[in-house]
C-alpha cells in the first residue's frame, strides 16, 4: 500500500462501531477523516459532539457531505436500511463504500454491482470485519469438504436487531457452496417447542443467542461418527473489527467491482 492519503467519511460516528472507526481514521497516518454523517448535530464537529480528536464536520445530508468534502471512501456502520441508501448514494457520487451493515438482498447486490461497473470504482460489503471471524468462515468452508454434518451457533449482545447474524448466514452460504444439501438431524424429528431446532438454510441449522455481556461470537460445530470439530471465534470488544475496516479501506481503492465478504480480499 502506498502512503497516498485516503480521504474518509464515516456514517454513524456516534455508534459503538462508529466511535472505533473514528479513532482508526484519526490514528492511521495515511487516512484523513474529512467528514461524518449522522441524523443530528449538522455542521458541528466531532470534537464538539463526541470529544473526538478531529474537527471534521458532521452532516445530516449525505449528498452535501460528499459534495463539500470530496471523500475517497465512505465507511458505513449504520443500520441495514440506512446503509443501503448510503451505499447507493456513495456510488452515485463516485465515492467507494466500505459497509459493515447486513441485510442486502441478492437484488440489492446486483444493483450495486451494476453501479460499480458504471462508475468504474470498487465497493466492499462485509458481514464481519474481524479478521479472525473471516478466517473461521474460510476454515469452515474447508472443513465442510470432509464433514457433511454441521450446525452454527452465533451469540451476540442483546441489542442486536437481526437474527441470525450476517456472519452466520455468510458462513452457511460458504459451507453450502462445497456441501451437498442435506437435511440435518433425524428425518422424523419433532420440535416439542416451535423453533427449538433453530433456523435452516440449505439444510444447515442456525441458532442465535442474545444476552447482555456478549459482543460477537460464533461456533461452527461439525460432527462425524466418533468425532466432532469445533471452530469458534470471539470478539471481546469492537476494536477487534478495526483491522478489517482498515484493510477494506485500503483494498477498496484498488478494485473496480463489488466485493461481498472480507474473505474475498484476503489471501
Curated annotation (Swiss-Prot):
The active site is at 156 (proton donor/acceptor), 160 (proton donor). It is an enzyme of class 1 (oxidoreductase). Pathway: Amino-acid biosynthesis; L-lysine biosynthesis via DAP pathway; (S)-tetrahydrodipicolinate from L-aspartate: step 4/4. One of its GO terms (cellular component) is cytosol. InterPro entries: DapB_C, DapB_N, DapB_N_CS, DHDPR_bac, NAD(P)-bd_dom_sf. GO terms for molecular function: 4-hydroxy-tetrahydrodipicolinate reductase; NAD binding; NADP binding; oxidoreductase activity, acting on CH or CH2 groups, NAD or NADP as acceptor. One of its GO terms (biological process) is lysine biosynthetic process via diaminopimelate. Belongs to the DapB family. Catalyzes the conversion of 4-hydroxy-tetrahydrodipicolinate (HTPA) to tetrahydrodipicolinate. PANTHER family: 4-HYDROXY-TETRAHYDRODIPICOLINATE REDUCTASE 1, CHLOROPLASTIC-RELATED (PTHR20836:SF0), DIHYDRODIPICOLINATE REDUCTASE (PTHR20836). This is 4-hydroxy-tetrahydrodipicolinate reductase. It comes from Bacillus velezensis (strain DSM 23117 / BGSC 10A6 / LMG 26770 / FZB42) (Bacillus amyloliquefaciens subsp. plantarum).
